[in-house]
Amino acid sequence: MQTHDEICDLLNTDPFVAQLLAAPIPARLAYVTPDGEPRVAPVSYLWNGKAFVFASPPHFSRIAALRANPNVAFTVDTTDFPPVVMMVRGSTSIEIVQGVPEEYVEASRRIVGEDRMENWERIVREEIKEMALVTIT
């Protein structure tokens, strides 16, 4: 089994991973709800060099589920042929933060697009008062 440092080194240097991290593709996050049911949800994510990070409103059901069971898996993949696929498993930690965390803004940038980013960010900062910042290691 690889160590966390070895995994980080791979994620920070592999050209296929770099392609996926730069692509406008959400992660498909798999988790288990408190009643034991599996769920998959798309999330905009960020790799910070040591962990994957995403943010959600703290009242979303996925946050309660992750508190009850922090084990997750996710995939990021292309639809081209041949497909490029990154599959990750890990454990989450959750921090409630005031306002909109920069990680959320940066994670959303690839999906929203630079041409719409200024307006999107203004609206999000006006409407969101707190978020759950989720770190996957």
Q: Which sequence ranges carry the predicted segments?
A:
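Short beta-strand segments
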Residues: P24-P58, L66, A73-V76, M86-V88
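Structural motif corresponding to alpha-helix initiation and N-cap regions
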Residues: D14, H59-F60, M117
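Short secondary-structure boundary/capping segments
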Residues: A18-Q19, S44, A64, V124-E126
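A generic structural signal for nonpolar/aromatic side chains embedded in well-ordered alpha-helices
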Residues: L20-L21, L66, A107, I136
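Short, surface-exposed beta-strand-loop junctions and turns on beta-sheet-rich folds
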Residues: F60-R62, F81
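Short, basic/aromatic recognition patches
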Residues: Q2-R28
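A short, polar/charged loop/turn motif at coil->beta-strand junctions and beta-hairpin connectors
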Residues: L20-A23, P82, E130
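Charged, gly/pro-rich active-site loop segments
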Residues: M1-L11, V84-T137
